[in-house]
Structures are given as structure tokens and as C-alpha cells.
Amino acid sequence: MINIGLSGSTGKMGKTITERIDKFKDCKISAKFNSTNNLDDLDNFCKNSDVIIDFSTPEILEKLINYALKHNTKLVIGITGLQPQHFKLLEKAAQTLPILYSANMSIGANLLSYLARKATKILDDYDIEILETHHRNKKDSPSGTAIMLAETIASEKGLNIAFNRGNRPRCEKEIGISSLRGGNVHGIHEISFLGDDEIITLKHEALNKNSFAIGAIKAAIWLQDKSPALYSMQDIYNYSLKKQL
């Protein structure tokens, strides 16, 4: 039985993971951490967990990593809004621990990333734009998923990523990200490939948070026998595909 520690347990993702964990017979939630806890509580939290799923806030990440290193506790990080210094912490810790980071844990969003990479190779002379839509209370903009998609596409074509063009026209070697906020939208991501004569759009819409929660739990299970490294959800799906072939 895999003991999963849940960080951010009182948030929307934490509650959804708690609801979905019973679908998995080989793991259980052994410890919880949320905003009512003291940061020093992370010591016992990590000690009582084989792996931690973290959907809290960037502010606790450094402390969480330090205690995870102390107790050799694996990490699944789903926090968005991370800054370059946070990724440096993850990369350094991943030399000692297996860590999986993803801005989006759902299979659909990661399939969208895969398809976008393939389409980018084929549609070489098309302009590419991303539109992401989320609920009115989402704090970060653009979304972590939109950035993930843009970075995937940009790496294929050597493009710059434009978050806010202001009053200037579109540059030739760039991919733009636009954001909408409103309502109770769980997440919509559209990638448009715009040619002179046609437009091709790839779209993923999350109807609820279940797919994110299930993906995070699967990531925690998958990570159990992995060597120290910084993994992504793409590693899980590539690994699963290879096992089937």
C-alpha cells in the first residue's frame, strides 16, 4: 500500500483527490497538509508519506522539498505560478529524489500537447496562437498549461512566446498566448494554426477536476520505482505506450 501525503488538502484539487482516491486499491491518503498547518508540520507530513501530491502554493515549496529530502519522500508537484527559482529547486532536488512536475495532470491536456507538437512539424508555415479560458478566481495568467503548450510548440520551431503584445503587430517568429477569465470554467485550451486559406484548431476542455485528480494519483503510483530525476506527465504516457507495443 502506497502512503500518499496530500498537500493543499482543503483546496479544490485536494478535495477532488480525496474523493477519487478510493478508486485506487493500491494507495491511500496517509497525511494531509493545508493552510491551517504550521510549516514545521511538514516534517512529520513527509515522514509519514511515501510520496506527496502537492497542490498548495509556491510559498511552501522550498520547505516541502527540504523535508522531502530529509525523509526520502517522492514528490508530485502540480502547483502553477512557479517562478524560475522554484524550478531550480526542483531540478536540484531531482538529483536525489524522483520528482514529477506538471502544470496539468490530465491525459487529455497532455495528449493535446503531443498532437500540437506533431501538428507544428507538419504545418510549418502557419501562424500559431493559444487561447486559454479559466474561472474568474484563477490567480495566475496565462495558465501553466498554456505555458506548457507554448513551450512545447516553441521548442519545435524556435519561436518566441508573447504573453502581451500591447499595441504592436504580431512578429513573424512568435507564438502568442491570450487569456480569458470568467464564470466557473475549469479550463479550456485552444491552439489555432492559422494559414492564409484555412485554420486548424486543437482544443481541450476540462468538464470538472476529476481528470486532474486521477492523473495526479496515477503519477504518484508511477513514481514509486523510478530513479531520481525530474519527470513530466509525458514520461508517464510515453512509458505506458512503450509497454503496450
UniProtKB/Swiss-Prot annotation:
CDD domains, per database record: DHDPR_N (cd02274)
Catalysed reaction equations from the record: (S)-2,3,4,5-tetrahydrodipicolinate + NAD(+) + H2O = (2S,4S)-4-hydroxy-2,3,4,5-tetrahydrodipicolinate + NADH + H(+); (S)-2,3,4,5-tetrahydrodipicolinate + NADP(+) + H2O = (2S,4S)-4-hydroxy-2,3,4,5-tetrahydrodipicolinate + NADPH + H(+)
This protein's pathway: Amino-acid biosynthesis; L-lysine biosynthesis via DAP pathway; (S)-tetrahydrodipicolinate from L-aspartate: step 4/4
PROSITE patterns reported for this sequence: DAPB
NCBIfam families for this protein: dapB (TIGR00036)
Organism of this sequence: Rickettsia felis (strain ATCC VR-1525 / URRWXCal2)
Residues the record lists as binding NAD(+): 8-13, 78-80, 102-105
UniProt keyword annotation of Lyase present: no
HAMAP family: DapB (MF_00102)
Primary location class: cytoplasm
GO BP field: diaminopimelate biosynthetic process; lysine biosynthetic process via diaminopimelate
Keyword Isomerase: no
Subcellular location, record wording: Cytoplasm
Gene: dapB
Class of enzymatic activity (EC top level): oxidoreductase
Keyword field: Amino-acid biosynthesis, Cytoplasm, Diaminopimelate biosynthesis, Lysine biosynthesis, NAD, NADP, Oxidoreductase
InterPro entries: DapB_C, DapB_N, DapB_N_CS, DHDPR_bac, NAD(P)-bd_dom_sf
Free-text function comment from the UniProt entry: Catalyzes the conversion of 4-hydroxy-tetrahydrodipicolinate (HTPA) to tetrahydrodipicolinate.
Family note: Belongs to the DapB family.
Binding-site list for (S)-2,3,4,5-tetrahydrodipicolinate: 135, 144-145
One Gene Ontology MF term: NAD binding
Protein name: 4-hydroxy-tetrahydrodipicolinate reductase
Pfam entry (one): DapB_N
EC number: 1.17.1.8
GO cellular component: cytosol
